[in-house]
Design a protein with these regions (language model features):
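Append "and, occasionally, other polyanion-binding protein interfaces
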Residues: 2-117
Length: 117
């Protein structure tokens, strides 16, 4: 299976929601995550649905869902590589490392506090 980031970027652009991040900033986070996923697993990230792309884009600027949807980001896109690196360095049982896992629950919040505080 080959992951086509250009096609992913086109789909993302077509469904991109209002966000404190630009499309390019969000795509840079996705690209970094997908590169680390391939490095970690040895295979490309599986495709994700447009609805999942929208949810991730909506959540990305905010550490906690409680405060999501505002005009100002809680976390800058430039902070994501450190969080993603820490995520892949953490051992999880029965985890496929899909980006949906990274953006679920409080995982990013915990990595944020571990890495940046």
């Amino acid at each position: 299976m080959i992951f086509d980031f250009d096609k992913f970027a086109q789909i993302t652009a077509s469904v991109y929601p209002v966000s404190p991040y630009t499309l390019e900033e969000s795509l840079s986070v996705f690209r970094y995550y997908f590169e680390k996923y391939k490095e970690y697993t040895g295979r490309p990230h599986p495709p994700i649905r447009a609805s999942q792309i929208v949810r991730v884009c909506q959540d990305m600027p905010f550490i906690s869902r409680e405060y999501s949807g505002g005009l100002y980001a809680d976390i800058e896109p430039e902070a994501y590589p450190a969080l993603i690196d820490r995520y892949f360095a953490t051992k999880y049982r029965n985890c496929d490392r899909n980006i949906n896992h990274f953006f679920s629950g409080r995982i990013r919040e915990m990595k944020f506090y571990e890495e940046l505080y």
